[in-house]
Structures are given as C-alpha cells and as structure tokens.
C-alpha cells in the first residue's frame, strides 16, 4: 500500500466515524437543506419585479409590464414555495403539513410584495434626500450597497415573521457578504430608512428602528456580551432607536434596555449602553491632537517616519 493510499484510508475512517457520531454532518434523517443558490437567484430575480426597468434583461418589462410581472412572479412563486417546503421538511414536519405550510406562507409573501415595494420607495427617497452626493434615485438603486442591503432585509424580514427556517438568514448573510452590511432579518425597521456608505454596519436581531432613521458606516446596534447564550434567544437584547435619529460613523449602541429618543443625533465614535432622551445631541470628547513642526532635511536621520 502506498503512503498516499494509507493516509487517505485513515482520513476516511476517522471522518466517517465522526459522521456517525454527529448527525449534524449528514443532516436530519438525510433530508435536504434549502438550496442556497436558488435563494440567491430568488433575491436577484425579485429585483426585476420591484424595479423592472433596472434589472430586467427582458425588454417586455417596460412595454408589457403586466405580462412580464405575471410571467416572472409565477416562476418566483414556485421557487420560493419549494424552498420553504424543503426547510420545513428538514425541521421534521410531515410531508403534507410542510407542503400546506409552505403554500400559505408563499401566498402571504407574494400578497405582501406591493407593500415591500412601497417601503423600499420610502427608503430610496430617504437615501436621495439624505445624500447630497447622490446624483439621482437611479444611481442609488443601481449602486448603493446600503440600499441593496435594505432591499434584501425587507424580503427576509417577511419570511422571518413567518418563522421560516434557514431562508431569512441565508438571505441576510448573502447581503452581508456582498455589501459588508449585517442586518439580521429579525430586526424591526420603519420606513424612510437609509444607510450611508454602509461598510461595517451591524443591526442585531431584536433591534427596533423607527421612521426616518439614518446610519453611517461602522455603526453597531448590538447586544451586550453575555455568557447566557441560548437562554436569551427570545429576549430583547438590542437597542430601540426612535424616529428621526441620525447615528454617525463607528458608534456603538448596545443593550436591550437602551432607547435612543426621537430627534436625537449620536456623534461618531461614541459607545452607548444607556438610554438617551429625545431631542438630544451626543458626542464623544475629542482626543487631544499632538502637532509637531516638520523637521529639516538634516534632522531626518531616523529610519522611521514616526517618532515620539
């Protein structure tokens, strides 16, 4: 026996032994998990329904919108229903019950699509009103990562409220990887919501955000660290942000009892774990800057550019 074959056989034996001990590796009763690729394609294809003139490759979208939308929705409806059914089957539901469950949820989801579109239009308006660098709403739809992350969140949140396993989180983590913006599908977010720049924004599962809220890059709406883990699964762990609040870059607002009152501005680089009253401006004390005069060429003999 060659060394290569020996190593492979030993690895196979150890791996399969672990598979037998931990059902996690092979799934529950060998049931399929939802297809991640199908769900990502669903996200992409739904954009051609919400904004048909932008993401549709079919020219009929603008000429015969009724026919185009009916045709595309039929396919998307079947795709989502199938993936939801697979998710419930994996969770142990009986086949007929999972099928009926998926049918009802899919019906409610697509009945809610016009409302999702309405909410996104308010988010779009918030982005345009709040960013003087935006040349047009079209630019925001096409290119802003914050708007894309919000779009995916609004789809995923509807399924989260229906207690659909796996799919809402697959959606949100796809958006997270694509944009660098992490919005848990369980968060509750009002209309006219805007994330400017966006990289590094984190919004936790039990966060509540009111109307007309604006976040900048690096903002965390998170939980205080705890060792209780799963014991807090259904407990409010993340802050509440009231209407008309702006939170500037790299600020952290933490804790389930923390409430930021309406019409409040949170300055950058702040760390907040207690409630802030309405109509307030919060800022961190600026660090002292040390400014030195430039040295002459004769003096610059040190190897390093930085010197105390």
Q: What name fits each language-model region?
A:
Residues 1-173, 296-308:
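Terminal amphipathic alpha-helical/low-complexity segments used for targeting or macromolecular assembly
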Residues 175-290, 294:
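Structural signal for interior beta-strand "rungs" in well-ordered beta-sheet cores
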């Amino acid at each position: 026996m060659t060394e290569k074959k020996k190593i492979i056989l030993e690895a196979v034996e150890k791996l399969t032994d672990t598979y037998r001990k931990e059902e996690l590796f092979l799934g529950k009763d060998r049931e399929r998990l939802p297809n991640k690729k199908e769900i990502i394609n669903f996200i992409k294809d739904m954009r051609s329904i919400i904004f048909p003139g932008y993401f549709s490759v079919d020219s009929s979208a603008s000429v015969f919108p009724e026919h185009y939308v009916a045709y595309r929705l039929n396919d998307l409806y079947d795709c989502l229903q199938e993936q939801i059914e697979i998710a419930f089957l994996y969770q142990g539901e009986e086949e007929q019950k999972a099928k009926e469950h998926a049918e009802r949820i899919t019906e409610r989801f697509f009945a809610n699509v016009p409302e999702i579109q309405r909410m996104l239009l308010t988010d779009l308006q918030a982005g345009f009103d709040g960013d003087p660098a935006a040349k047009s709403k079209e630019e925001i739809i096409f290119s802003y990562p914050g708007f894309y992350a919000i779009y995916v969140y609004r789809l995923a949140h509807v399924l989260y409220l229906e207690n659909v396993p796996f799919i809402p989180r697959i959606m949100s983590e796809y958006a997270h990887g694509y944009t660098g913006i992490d919005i848990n599908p369980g968060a509750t977010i009002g209309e006219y919501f805007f994330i400017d720049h966006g990289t590094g924004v984190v919004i936790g599962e039990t966060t509540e955000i009111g109307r007309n809220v604006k976040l900048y890059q690096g903002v965390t709406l998170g939980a205080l660290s705890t060792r209780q883990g799963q014991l807090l699964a259904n407990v409010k762990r993340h802050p509440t942000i009231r209407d008309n609040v702006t939170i500037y870059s790299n600020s952290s607002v933490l804790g389930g009892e923390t409430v930021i009152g309406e019409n409040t501005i949170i300055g950058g680089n702040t760390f907040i774990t207690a409630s802030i009253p309405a109509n307030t401006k919060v800022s961190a004390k600026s660090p002292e800057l040390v400014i030195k005069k430039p040295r002459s060429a004769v003096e610059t003999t040190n190897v390093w550019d930085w010197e105390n």
